[in-house]
């Protein structure tokens, strides 16, 4: 297939996924998955974020609803039945969009869970701001980052860009 055909197919797949997410609740939260994604992107826009950061905010949870649930291990209702090759929704989403978006956007989507782990490590009070569902998925995503991992991550030039969407997401 042509690149245009592949792009059209991917766009259709994402639009179908977003349409399906319009009716599904976001975990145990009082909002749908679609509303959650749109809200995060809108907060990014209102904060003056650049286009790539806004796109990453829109797509940060695409791995939750655009693929077979057995591929994902970090949702409370899917954790038990996840297959042996299951990944977190952040990795699934980043892998899904990587061929179609700038590298930074895919990296920001991939860092979505690690940004939560990082913030819990450097700001102990941040954990208290998380919903019960987000606290639960934190344990599935590796828990609070170790000091060694924090030290390694702080050297990344896009760390601040990964943390901003995390705060808008909560």
Regions found by a protein language model. Name each.
Residues 5, 28-31, 84:
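Short N-terminal micro-motifs specific to bacterial/archaeal maturation
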Residues 1-2, 150:
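N-terminal amphipathic/basic-hydrophobic helices that include classical n-h-c signal peptides
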């Amino acid at each position: 297939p042509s690149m245009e055909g592949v792009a059209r197919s991917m766009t259709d797949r994402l639009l179908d996924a977003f349409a399906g997410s319009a009716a599904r609740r976001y975990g145990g939260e009082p909002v749908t998955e679609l509303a959650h994604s749109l809200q995060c992107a809108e907060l990014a826009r209102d904060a003056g974020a650049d286009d790539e950061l806004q796109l990453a905010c829109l797509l940060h949870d695409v791995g939750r609803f655009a693929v077979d649930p057995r591929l994902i291990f970090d949702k409370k209702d899917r954790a038990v039945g996840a297959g042996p090759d299951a990944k977190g929704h952040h990795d699934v989403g980043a892998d899904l969009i990587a061929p179609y978006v700038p590298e930074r956007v895919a990296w920001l989507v991939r860092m979505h869970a690690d940004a939560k782990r990082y913030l819990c490590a450097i700001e102990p009070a941040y954990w208290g701001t998380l919903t019960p569902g987000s606290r639960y998925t934190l344990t599935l995503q590796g828990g609070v980052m170790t000091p060694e991992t924090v030290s390694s991550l702080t050297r990344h030039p896009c760390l601040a860009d990964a943390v901003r969407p995390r705060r808008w997401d909560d």
